[in-house]
């Protein structure tokens, strides 16, 4: 965020109260994406967006006066040009382009409204760190990895154009790379021509709940463009999985919850570390928030928690919706309360076709199940064997009124975890009857339905066999070539 004395003065005149440097510095956090938003910071962001939109509009008008198009590159910093903000359309841009790190960044671009077309720059960039003598096979492998993750998202909502960046003279020395890039371009054109004319079928409406909501759509738990961080990859996998699943995805904040928006969704996901914007911090102390979500689930909605959902220590609980989730975290405060629910029941609709052990990434410790919760997976220490107050729950389900919840300690991206998340969405959303509709049993393959045709993809570099179910549940075995 930017700041200046003039901006502070104009903010005061418009909003009627003062903003100070400390409101931006925020004790040294500088209001990074992971910091829980304050109302004052929201106002200042809106103020900045309006100013930038007015300024950029002058520039785009100049560009258009010369008969040219105005395109913005979505980089690591875009102060005031929030692509999912209320004022983005006022910039009057023609196009948006950004780097593609996988499915999440595809959707971060392709879901934007207010421009005529969106473009993705694929990896690897044509730079000497990749395009040096003897490294062609690695360059092709990186291209394939990037395309396979991006393609999952393209099957749901494709970009309008794809390209590369860097020095063409370097890429020209790698004929295998050029040939593979040409194949990918042909495949992209076919996907685009199909998906842009026929909306893919979605089987559930999912809302991701955090402090930011829509303005940080597809940017949750992310630093820059899908850079890997040990502290965030266990959450990042949720959004990578969602980017290519047959579900409609929205991003909502706590004001949306209080304003009755939950009725528009089948399942709500809350994921993140305690105290962060992604989990929600002290928003979970708002009685209206927890009441609205309890009511939503009790009446048949689904709730999925990952990591430390609804987390803030208060009133003897760490997970404020532990009654809905069926689990809580022992923080050393309730050790005197015996915990007997440690029996594992791994067979469940959610885990059908899923291989154990499940990859939980960085995981979470000291999660315990409340009485009545169904424990799907739990880990025990070999230091002490007993029947009470032992074990750490990894995965669990719970029933709350007519609704259901699912908890998991972490969900890094993999084909198996994407399938697990999809099945969790169907189960919590009371949609098990849609299980074998446009569906592949082999998690390395996926199916998409477009009204009059299906697409079945192989997301690996090896041949795959899968049982495929059409929209009516009819099964057939398919042999799929690599990619």
Outline where the language-model segments fall.
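The substrate-binding groove and active-site-proximal loops of carbohydrate-active enzymes
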Residues: 36-53, 91-100, 130-141, 165-168, ...
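Extracellular ligand-binding/catalytic regions of CAZymes and related secreted enzymes
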Residues: 146-149, 158, 166-205, 241-244, ...
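Active-site clefts of carbohydrate-active enzymes
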Residues: 34, 111-141, 170-174, 214-217
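Aromatic-Pro/Gly-enriched surface loop or interdomain linker
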Residues: 151, 157, 179-265, 450-451
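Hydrophobic faces of well-ordered beta-strands that scaffold small-molecule active sites
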Residues: 70-73, 94-98, 118-124, 160-164
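Acidic (Asp/Glu)-rich catalytic clusters
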Residues: 87-88, 106-118, 154-158
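Polysaccharide-binding and catalytic clefts of secreted carbohydrate-active enzymes
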Residues: 1-93, 99-102, 106-109, 196
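A glycine-rich, often tryptophan-bearing local segment used as a flexible ligand/cofactor-contacting loop or short
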Residues: 280-357
